[in-house]
Amino acid sequence: LLTVNGKKVFSLYHLKNNVTMRIYLCLLSFSVLLNISCNSKHAGKTEDAEKDTYVNPLFTEGPNPNAIYHDGKYYYTHETNDQIFLWVTTDITDMPRSTCKEVWVPKDPSNSYHLWNPEIRNIDGKWYIYFAADDGNTDNHQIYVIENDSPDPMQGEFRMKGAIMTNPEWNWGIHPSTFEHKGELYLLWSGWPNRRIGSETQCIYIARMENPWTLATKRVMISQPEYEWERQWINPDGGRTAYPIYVNESPQYFHSKDNQTVIVYYSASGCWSPYYCTGMLTADADSDLLNPASWKKSPVPVFQQKPEDGVYGPAGLSFIPSPDGTEWYVLYQARSIPSGNTGESETRNPRLQKIGWDANGMPDLGIPLPVNTPLPKPSGTVTNQ
């Protein structure tokens, strides 16, 4: 007996004597099975598509992200203010499922506060993390480096190598970044020309290194805030810092497709504002990188806010290859609201996009895309297990 809402509809006896109904039920059953099969196939395709794509942000928060690709794995870090964490993964787009370890907790009061912009590097088989820290007064920020001689940075122990003296007066220094060029190791960073009095001007400096923790040359300024888009420090709502701050910071090395042009990307204007953006310096690969005349600055930002898509302050770049080496990706920070309080990190989060190359072989960063936009994973990605 088949009932619906307590009412008898028909019985097995009726079915046996009703050929039409029997045929109808057979067709109905076939239709249901076909629908289930189609839905299963569609679900499978959807799951496959989701496995092959990702969306930004990589984390809900995490300013100043940095990553490198080494021996089949990505090593990633971002700013957490009072300690340093390191993540390892085979899938840079699936950071919540990566392995994380706290690798540094400062003990010296002189460098236990405001740990900014950590950068992970492998130099001559050893692991180094560069960062800036202070004694509680941000005016006293200096650059520090820690070292781990284990082949695996998630093992062993990071030990303090010391502060890097960027100038005899120990003027302010933040956002260190190293790169190798023609067999030489260089350090880029953001610093003050002189001790701040009334206002603050952050400039980009470069020096050649004797070893990963010591400079071999005096610092050379290669950029200072000069264009209007580099000197924004007041938010649209009127919010501002206690004094004017003109910003060039977060320098990061990259190169043209043929490696004949050295590129330094940097962040400009206040990170608390929607005007935070990315500038670009270029030099011929055969030029003297310690000669300021070797460097040319783009008169316009090369990566900036897109308010109509809810993307503000895209900057703080680093570059990583796809696992198979056929693609390059830019890792950067941005926020989904126009403004943040000075020093606030919670509204900034890490994002990843594939870059292209223009007709001259220069990187084409494109435009910062809205969050939750499905994007193809880097070529050759092995999903986290």
Named regions from a protein language model:
Residues 1-47:
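Bacterial Sec-dependent N-terminal signal peptides
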Residues 38-385:
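Carbohydrate-active catalytic/glycan-binding domains of CAZyme proteins
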